[in-house]
Amino acid sequence: MAPFSAETNSTDLLSQPWNESPVILSMVILSLTFLLGLPGNGLVLWVAGLKMQRTVNTVWFLHLTLADLLCCLSLPFSLAHLALQGQWPYGRFLCKLIPSIIVLNMFASVFLLTAITLDRCLVVFKPIWCQNHRNVGTACTICGCIWVVAFVMCIPVFVYREIFTTDNHSKCGYKFDLSGSLDYLDFYGNPLENRSLENIFQLPGEMNDRLDPSSFQANDHPWTVTTAFHTQTFQRPSADSLPKDSASHSPYSNVFKPAGVASPKIPSGFPIEGHKTSPLDDSDAFLSTHLKLFPSAASNSLYEYELPQDFQDYYSLGQFTYDNQVSTPLVAITITRLVVGFLLPSVIMIACYSFIVLRMQRGRFAKSQGKTLRVAVVVVTVFLVCWAPYHISGVLSLFTDPETPLGKTLMSWDHVFTALASANSCFNPFLYALLGKDFRKKARQSIQSILEAAFSEELTHSTHCSSNNVFSERNSISTTV
């Protein structure tokens, strides 16, 4: 996920090209979301929580508004993160907290929308059961369970988010192992740091750091070279970032010439014509596209050798080999978000509203039911439009080489997808609340009471009048939205 998802998505601004147009578009979306979503959600939260009678519907939307309001409050940090080109000046705790809040909002919103959908379906198909069992207490209990599950789903974000320092700038990103994910710039620095030599370079017959030529057998490929590099995820550098003389700057040059380790001796009886005394000291031998450790003896069966395919790819292409292996926690996080946070709720919503439409076409329902259905369908549609690009790009990023055109496109527009997902928190109050006739009436009345209290010379009288008006109309409030 771009900055916080990532969501979502494992890439951060640190590893993404700074494409000005998508970033500006993302900042515009986030700014509008904050400017519209903060007062909109605040108004809904105040009116639904304090001015309207507590019903099952108001409980659903009250909790949904709370989740959206938390997301809106975190948007200024996202804007600053984009404006600073990925730098994170807020410290380690906020690096963990703010992305967690965004993910918490994501799961809480989708779970609440799913609960609202199931609730509407039960009202249509089981009206008698709902009359006996559908109450505010049950709705509050379900909302509490939803918050607990959403909190559990955001724990991996809080655990794996860490601060990285690159070029004296702090970055907020995922860290899935104790040693951290090294960037190719760090790889140039010291590839053997905190690594034991025997785990990097070994020869057959080498026991306890001693080379025993007598252990070689003539028919056992005596000079087979094996390597065992620790699993580490590196990013392929661009062509411009590599030195022109990549051979002289090869990060493997020190691996094959470790200080203090004697070069292996050629067993007696082996042909040595044209052979260098210390083949491991000859960097050209390892930079050859054919990887001939012993050029003069390449055709001799006694000098057969084997090197890992990644070394062959590296030296034949003259660049690092891109490791397509993705971290297991990242795959688990992305797939869980896709299935639990998008696919399963989407299937439930589409199925329930399809059944409701069919049922309403067969029976006679009040106009209020039709209005509720239209508002709910719009809310679900907007949710799918906002969140589908985020989840799709997250899954594609797991299986796409970032050097391909598709990979570059995903990285460039990842910020836009994340901003669009956050915009869902702005649309909800205008869709499900402000479109409702009863809510518009109560909102106008509440705003009017605020203005009267602010400008009236008789504050007590104005407040008393508005309070009486609120009390007199409570009995006429409908439970539909």
Curated annotation (Swiss-Prot):
Keyword Disulfide bond carried by entry: yes
Q: How does it sit in the membrane?
A: Multi-pass membrane protein
Residues bearing PTM Phosphothreonine: T460
Gene3D superfamilies according to UniProt: Rhodopsin 7-helix transmembrane proteins
Protein localization: Cell membrane
Q: Which family does it belong to?
A: Belongs to the G-protein coupled receptor 1 family.
| Name of the protein in question | C3a anaphylatoxin chemotactic receptor
Q: Which organism is it from?
A: Macaca fascicularis (Crab-eating macaque)
Lineage of the organism:
Eukaryota, Metazoa, Chordata, Craniata, Vertebrata
Q: Which gene is transcribed and translated to give this protein?
A: C3AR1
